Regions:
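Residue-level signature of the transmembrane alpha-helical core
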Residues: 48-51, 87, 91, 117, ...
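Alpha-helical transmembrane segments and their helix-entry boundary regions
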Residues: 82, 134, 148-149, 187-191
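Aromatic-anchored segments of alpha-helical transmembrane domains
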Residues: 26-35, 91-100, 153-162, 196-206
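N-terminal, membrane-interfacial amphipathic/helix-forming hydrophobic leader that caps
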Residues: 1-68, 202-225
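Short, aromatic-rich membrane-interface segments at the entry and exit
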Residues: 40-49, 108-113, 164-171
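"…centered on the first transmembrane helix and the immediately adjacent amphipathic helix/loop
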Residues: 52-55, 59-112
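Function-critical hydrophobic alpha-helical transmembrane segments in multi-pass membrane proteins
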Residues: 54, 97-98, 102, 106-158
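Functionally important transmembrane alpha-helices
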Residues: 33-35, 167-223
């Protein structure tokens, strides 16, 4: 191998390592909060520290790569097409969840439902951005689209562990949102799908299947096995 080819190969590997390290650091910051900080009485500043640092890293990474908000999927571009592609699986999943709720007589409004619903739009958009606008885009730099989609969905499910029903639901949702984002990247459309599905899960899934939406170590503290 010639010197230029060796240098090019080394640069490629370094770039891949940087992309992978960025994804791992963001995922670890989320897991740190879920497993080491959130279950215990810590200050708000300490609790928000890792996510804030992760957000700064993501924004800096976008700046270094000259990625714009429009490029990431914030904006009107592809919105109609993405929403159309997501409509089928989203409505099908909603119908299935409501059917399960009807059959099991579990349709209900949980405590603080409307308050939680008011917070959901911003929360699901942040999740979609972290999952697709950042993690998927970084993995996509050195992986085949299908590989990147599956791994991204797996990471999204991982941060919802050990809540098994949520792990399954988020993995399936991550696959659908990832496939659509690969074709027509629009975060607002995927956030709408995420919002509708989350609201349906809250009112339709039986409590004996999904007793709460808690994740991480707090889930183990609040649920006996």
């Amino acid at each position: 191998m010639s010197a230029p080819e060796s240098s090019s190969s080394s640069n490629t590997l370094s770039w891949q390592a940087i992309n992978l390290a960025e994804v791992i650091s963001v995922v670890l910051s989320i897991l740190l909060v879920e497993w080491a900080l959130a279950p215990f009485a810590v200050s708000v500043w300490l609790l928000g520290g890792p996510p804030l640092l992760a957000l700064v890293l993501m924004l800096y990474s976008h700046r270094c790569r000259r990625e714009t908000a429009q490029t990431l999927g914030f904006g009107g571009r592809y919105f109609d097409r993405a929403l159309l592609l997501l409509a089928g699986p989203t409505l099908l999943a909603i119908a299935a969840l409501i059917f399960v709720g009807y059959v099991t007589h579990s349709l209900h409004l949980p405590d603080r439902f409307w308050a939680r619903l008011c917070l959901l739009p911003g929360w699901v958009l942040l999740q979609q951005y972290t999952m697709l606008g950042f993690s998927y885009r970084r993995l996509r730099q050195f992986l085949h689209p299908y590989q990147a989609i599956i791994i991204t969905a797996g990471l999204f499910a991982l941060v919802h562990a050990p809540n098994v029903p949520l792990v399954i639901l988020t993995f399936l949702g991550g696959l659908i949102w990832g496939f659509v984002y690969e074709r027509v990247p629009n975060l607002f459309a995927s956030a709408i799908s995420h919002l509708l599905l989350s609201a349906t899960v809250l009112v339709a899934v039986p409590e004996w299947v999904l007793p709460s939406m808690t994740v991480g170590y707090r889930y183990l503290l609040y649920h006996s096995f």
